Amino acid sequence: MNQDRLRDVFDGAFSRIALARKIVTPRLMLKEIGVIKSIGTGIAKVSGLPGTCFEEVLKFPGGYGIAFNIEEEEIGVILLGDHSHLRAGDEVERRGHVMDVPVGDALIGRIVNPLGRALDGEAPVISSRRMPIERPAPQIMDRAPVTVPLQTGIKVIDALIPVGRGQRELILGDRQTGKSAIALDTILNQKDENVVCIYCAIGQQASSVAKVVAALQENDALSYTVVVVTEGNDPPGLIYVAPYAATAIGEYFMEQGRDVLIVYDDLSHHARAYRELSLLMRRPPGREAYPGDIFYIHSRLLERATHLRPELGGGSLTALPIVETEAEDIAAYIPTNLISITDGQIYLSPTLFQLGILPAIDVGKSVSRVGGKAQRPVYRAATGELRLDYSQFSELETFTRFGGRLDERTRTVIEHGRRIRACLQQPESSPVSVSEQIILLLALTAKLFDEVPLENMGEAERAVRAVVLNIPPELLARMEANESLNDADRHALLWHASTALDGLGSAHAKA
């Protein structure tokens, strides 16, 4: 009996082995393996890989690279990691695909490098899907108009330079004028807006990145944010691919029908990294030693930001690229390139920054070319004359420095403009809600603040914002919704604002 059972076991095992031999056919795996000819700063010259495609990933001992220059005898490769251990003669293997990055919800709340490797000391990122970092931008017929506002929580931007979901709005200014602070405040304001945020640090100092991450953690913003980091001491190749990897992560969420905000901080470092790589590869230099395709590398990046049609999910990718100017020269090469690519710009003036006017946004040099159509109707009604009044004030204030005598009308315009400027000032990391902004803007347009002494403007603003707690819930709902306010609503809000300003110099009569 035992022999029969043993025979059955062996017969079953051998029959499965025979079946497996019929099904499985041994195959030879063809691999192309080349060798390193020379190593430079962040690049390598490789020979022996004739089938390599442009931007294909190559495997080095202990790291990866991307085929950047395809020549007859050799390939120029940009290295994506430490190359101090590499030597001439080391083997290089083709991977057969372009560079990709892990995408998905597993990345939210994580700090990673452009390769998807965790930098936050936690477990590796595990994702079932990867996407190539370089993808064609959506076709024209796949795009929808920008019609939904992206609230930044910054009064001067939401009122005068509105940003829409799917827009590309450039932030530019000299060093240390608050560019990153504006982008960070915008991320903080998306807390209850169901927007996935991506902060891409491009060649930044480690201390600057740590400060941003700390601010995100303190304000509980890391729970809806992905941080993609390259530091200044990273290889130029890794810095170069960082914004493309971050955009691929954002495109995944956009294609799921979600709204995404991505901040590139900053593209000046990206342009310099690309210039360094191009010069190392001996590509012909052009203006300011940048290669001839410097415009193209930024346009193909920023054109991926859009608002998709409802048939494609209706998701959006809003881009806030940052670029640094030198000595207030917004007509320099890289800034003008980006101004022409984007849908508007927010310019931060070092002069205003030195005067303590924060955020130091120069309204005269800032514009939003498509965001106005997405602005809430209640904002358009509240800010109808505000931009004109502020522009007139800025022009007249320049002439007052010459010490000439001013007529009554000019003095009125200047005093009104000073109160607009004071009311639009805002400390960092202090976003203002839609309802608070609307009542402030209505009070400014109605000139309720004109009787308030300048030194009391901070107190007056806080008093007006506090009356939001006393506004009927149905009126608050209309303010928050994308609806216009009728005359009765407007008068009710102005009455609340005027009441709050009693004792600070304002009068009921102006309401």
Swiss-Prot record:
Signal sequence residues: none
InterPro entries given in the database record: Alt_ATP_synth_F1_asu, ATP_synth_asu-like_sf, ATP_synth_asu_C, ATP_synth_asu_C_sf, ATP_synth_F1_a_nt-bd_dom, ATP_synth_F1_asu, ATPase_a/bsu_AS, ATPase_F1/V1/A1_a/bsu_N_sf
Record's bilayer topology term: Peripheral membrane protein
Required for activity (site feature) positions: 366
Residues the record lists as binding ATP: 173-180
Main location: membrane
EC identifiers of the protein: 7.1.2.2
Subunit structure of this chain's protein: F-type ATPases have 2 components, CF(1) - the catalytic core - and CF(0) - the membrane proton channel. CF(1) has five subunits: alpha(3), beta(3), gamma(1), delta(1), epsilon(1). CF(0) has three main subunits: a(1), b(2) and c(9-12). The alpha and beta chains form an alternating ring which encloses part of the gamma chain. CF(1) is attached to CF(0) by a central stalk formed by the gamma and epsilon chains, while a peripheral stalk is formed by the delta and b chains.
Family label: Belongs to the ATPase alpha/beta chains family.
Database matches in PANTHER family: ATP SYNTHASE SUBUNIT ALPHA, MITOCHONDRIAL (PTHR48082:SF2)
Name of this protein: ATP synthase subunit alpha 2
Gene name per UniProt: atpA2
